[in-house]
Amino acid sequence: MRGSLKRLEIGSSLGIGELLAICSLLENTNRVKAYSRSERGDSLPDSLDGMFEALEPLTPLTTEIRRCILSEDEISDDASSNLRQIRRNMKITGDRIHTQLSSLVNGSARNYLQDSVITMRNGRYCIPVKAEYKGQVPGMVHDQSSTGSTLFIEPMAIVKLNNDIRELELEEQKEIEVILSTLSQQTAEQTDSIRADLNIMVQLDVIFARASLAMDMNATEPIFNDEGRIRLKQARHPLIDKKKAVPIDIRLGDDFDLLVILSLIH
C-alpha cells in the first residue's frame, strides 16, 4: 500500500485492486474508531485515546470507491453515465447478433452446421460449420477444430455488428480508465491522511497483538532499575507450555549477585 501512495503522489493512476485495498484500510479504520468509542463510553481516559482520535475514516472517499467498484473484476454500471450507456449499447448489439445467428442456426444454415450453437472465437461471434460446406455459409473463418472437420465462421451478416461490439468494448475500457483516473485523483488528495491512518493502524495492531499475548501468558510489564537488582516473581519460560512450566521466584542484587542454574543432561 505504501507503494500505491507513492504512485499517487507522482500523479499515477491506481488499478482496481489498489483502490480496493485503500478502501478496505479506511473501512477498517472506521470500524476501529467506532469500536474505541463504544468500548470506552464514559470511562476514564486511555493511553490510546490520542491514536484513536487521530484516525480519519474518510467516509466520503470509501463511499465513492464502493459506488464505482463492485469487485476486483467489475466496475459498476453506475460509475458513470457514459459507462452505463456504453454497456446498454453493448447489450442491444449483442442481442441483435444473437437474433441473427439464431435465425441462421435454426434456419437456412442448419444443414451445414456441426452443431446448433453460437460460440466466440478471437472475440467474434461465430457458428461451427462443417468444413465441406464452407462455401455455403459466406463469412470469415476465425478458427477450426483440432481435426479440421469444423470451421468457426463469422457470417457476413453480422460482421458489422461484431465490429460495433468491438468498438464498444474499446470505448468501455477507455471509460473505465477515466473512472479509475478520477478515483485516483480523489484518493491522491488524501494521501497524507491515508498514510497517517496506515501508520496508526499498524501501531494499534502491534499493541493489541502484544496485549493479547500478554493476557494469554498472564504476563506483566517489567519495571526496570539501574541499581543492578533483579526480582522475578512466579516467572516461567515464555516458550514452554505454561501448563508444563514450573514458575519460580528469582532475586539477584540484594543478598547475593550470583546465580548458578544446573540442568539434567539427557
Could you tell me what each predicted segment is?
Residues 3, 21-24, 196-199, 203:
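Amphipathic alpha-helical interaction segments
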Residues 8-16, 30, 42-46, 62-264:
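Alpha-helical coupling/stalk and coiled-coil linker elements that connect catalytic or binding modules
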Residues 39:
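Hydrophobic, well-structured mid-protein blocks that either form specific transmembrane helices
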Residues 1-4, 8, 22-25, 29-32, ...:
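Amphipathic alpha-helices that form helix-helix packing interfaces
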